[in-house]
Swiss-Prot record:
One of its GO terms (cellular component) is cell division site. Interacts with FtsZ. It comes from Shewanella baltica (strain OS185). InterPro entries: ZapD, ZapD_C, ZapD_sf. The gene is zapD. This is Cell division protein ZapD.
């Protein structure tokens, strides 16, 4: 069996970042494989999230905070200065496009093809060729042309998604996995340091999955048996990382 990783955000900011990362991974998958009309679902979800909230200020604050921390680490001995320099350069480059006032994805509102599709995609079964003949035409295009179109649409969100990827990488790198045991399927942890993310790695052969709850200083993990859909009463060995 394989080891599965489960992540639980402990604040709203990381929750938003993880949702954006999830959509970004779907977008990248659609660039490599022809998923037909399904490729539009993550694109339209990203459009909606970007319209609801302008993440720019929050991301810029996070970039500045990490740059300050990385600069302090540069002065220490016994650290990987090359890796720190790579992150500083990447964050500095990712910061520049965020200075522009334009809202992410706003230009797609002017795209008549995208706008027509988006209105229909929220309706069950409304992607038939008699509802959206323009979609039927687009889907029949050669894969290379569709790929080029899709890449141009995604590009409107890269100024947001690129720094999100970097910030989550840095968050995850703050903790390594340690061995842990959930006695009777339950584990509770606490931390004097404010936590942002709990990561659980568990072997699928256990036949269970974790449900994680908590806040920045305390969290609880219940393991649930998948087949019975009830809390496990067995001791479960797993790996745990608590990221700040």
């Amino acid at each position: 069996m394989t080891e599965l990783v489960y992540e639980q955000p402990l604040n709203e900011k990381i929750r938003s970042y993880l949702r954006l990362e999830y959509l970004d991974k779907q977008l990248q998958s659609n660039l490599n494989h022809d998923h037909q009309h399904r490729c539009f679902y993550p694109l339209f979800s990203l459009c909606e999230l970007s319209e609801r909230c302008d993440y720019r200020n929050e991301v810029l604050k996070d970039i500045e905070r990490h740059l300050l921390q990385l600069s302090k680490w540069q002065e220490l001995d016994h650290v990987d200065h090359q890796q720190i320099d790579l992150y500083i350069n990447a964050l500095t480059q990712a910061r520049e496009p965020l200075q522009k006032p334009e809202r992410f994805g706003s230009q797609l509102k002017q795209d008549r093809f995208i706008s027509a599709l988006r209105q229909r995609f929220g309706m069950p079964g409304a992607c038939c060729n008699f509802d959206l003949p323009q979609l039927h035409y687009w889907l029949a295009k050669p894969w290379e042309e569709k790929q080029q179109d899709y890449r141009s649409w995604i590009a409107h969100f890269e100024p947001l998604l690129t720094p999100i990827t970097l910030l989550l990488q840095l968050t995850r790198s703050t903790a390594h996995y340690d061995n842990a045991v959930a006695h009777a399927g339950f584990y509770q942890g606490d931390s004097a340091q404010a936590l942002a993310l709990v990561r659980v790695k568990v072997d699928a052969s256990h036949g269970c999955y974790p449900t994680i709850s908590g806040h920045k200083n305390r969290f609880a993990i219940h393991f649930v048996q998948f087949e019975q859909q009830r809390h496990s009463d067995r001791s479960i060995d797993f790996l745990l990382a608590t990221c700040a």
